[in-house]
Curated annotation (Swiss-Prot):
This is Tropomyosin. Belongs to the tropomyosin family. The keyword Repeat applies. Residues 214-223 have a biased composition (Basic and acidic residues). Homodimer. InterPro entries: Tropomyosin (IPR000533). Residues 1-284 form a coiled coil. Residues 202-213 have a biased composition (Polar residues). Residues 202-223 are annotated as: Disordered. Transmembrane segments: none annotated. Keywords: Coiled coil, Repeat.
Amino acid sequence: MDAIKKKMLAMKMEKENAVDRAEQNEQKLRDTEEQKAKIEEDLNNLQKKCANLENDFDSVNEQVQVAMAKLETSEKRVTEMEQEVSGTTRKITLLEEDLERNEERLQTATERLEEASKLPDESERGARVLESRSLADDERIDQLEAQLKEAKYIAEDAERKYDEAARKLAITEVDLERAEARPKAAEAKILELEEELKVVGNNTKSLEISEQEASQREDSYEETIRDLTQRLKDAENRATEAERTVSKLQKEVDRLEDELLAEKEKYKAISDELDQTFAELAGY
């Protein structure tokens, strides 16, 4: 009888131990399922964050493309301004050559006046009048030369400004190339994140750190784009200023051409008077 009681007691204890072990296993199972659910939730969150990063990357890439288009437009405008400056410089060169020819003609007229001064006293008064006019023309030509030098200086200054604008555009282009390289690095990082998602159970913490780093790089891209946009605005402002300078220079060239034409007409009048004076002297 005692043996039966002991056996029953042993069976009861074994049953209780089995129940305890079952409860422990059930608890472990629940804990495991909760851990699994948490890991799956973290995985879903990381996948969403990765998708958001891809969308943000596409947006940044579009902004870079827009910045490149604006840069190309600015470069075209600067090229056009350089061509206009080149044309204006050619006009100034032609004006200088024309002015030199006018000076040679005036020198010839002066020599003729000197010859006329050697004639009899009856022609001396007419020669003095012509000489006075010639001196006035000399002063006018000197004034024109000074104005032409000033216009040439303005053209050279405009060329220097264009060179500076071209240099800054080249720097902006280098910065833009760097900005293009950074999205490629971001794309490679996203691919790396996708690979790490396959082993999320062991690399969850590492993925979270990578996500934070990607977010920081995104902020850096946005800052770079803002800087490029500002530089493009500066380039556009410089191009606008160059247009105003070219317009001012063109007006100055037109004015010089008008004054040169007037000087030619004065020279023709002097030549006619000289011819008339020589004709009168020949009559004496």
